[in-house]
Amino acid sequence: EGKKIVTDELHLENRDKLCVFHVTPDLVEKITNGTPTPPMCEVLAKNIGIRRATGDIICCVNLDVIVPPREHIDLMYQKLEVGDMITLTKQDVELEDLKKHFGDKTDIQHLMPVIFGVWPIQKRLMIPILSMNKELMLKQPEDNHHVCASIIQACGDFQIAHRKTWYEIRGFEEDMTRRLYHDTNVQYKVIMSGGKILASNTPHIYHIEHERNNTEENTNVIKHSYPSTNDEDWGSIKYTI
């Protein structure tokens, strides 16, 4: 109590240090020196973070997102109820543009809307309403459930919910080890457990644009998992060397 949150104290001293690493089997061999390591993927990493978080409100955000100022986030979740989840639409920005406008500065959250503006939510909106619950979902054909659960395109860059909500749905499905769709699936689980998803474009989040590999072998299959297929040890490394 009274201590500063660790992530509030993190600053990138030199933005030029941001690099792209191409992870290959040879690179992994070099880094690990051949030592067996626990299998890891995005969903497991997120779940480990959720299980280790200590607050009542847990925010899951991607590494390549510039989040809003803390005071804006604090205002956003004041009316968030247990069982519900908030997702924010992102706005893409180029790394070169960040360097051009800010150089090595890292305290830039308040300036982002001034420099880059704010996209209207319609730019990423997937359904014509900004919330979804189980009653509405069950009125839709099953083929539309994925779109209805997403609400906005790229819904998973910022999701916030009460700790009890994350634990009720057992986090992200840990068998979805590839790219895409696990964020929509976690929102589907919230909806089908009786909660609702609320989507907004405020406060504003900005995503550092990057290359993508959405080939079939790197992409999850769309699925709807409720109840969760995760076991009671979700969010832990189940691996013995």
Name these PLM-found stretches:
Residues E42-N47, V65, I73, A154-G156, ...:
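Conserved glycosyltransferase catalytic-site signature
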Residues G2-T7, L95-E96:
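Short, charged/polar "capping" segments at the starts of alpha-helices
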Residues G55-P68:
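Short beta-strand-to-loop acidic/aromatic patch adjacent to the donor-nucleotide binding site
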Residues V23, I86-Q91, S200-T202, Y206-I208:
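Short glycine/serine/threonine-enriched helix-capping/active-site loop
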Residues V147-C148, Q153-C155, D175-I241:
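C-terminal catalytic/acceptor-binding lobe
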Residues I50, P68-E174:
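Conserved catalytic core of nucleotide-sugar-dependent glycosyltransferases
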Residues V6-R52:
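Active-site-proximal specificity loops/subdomain of glycosyltransferases
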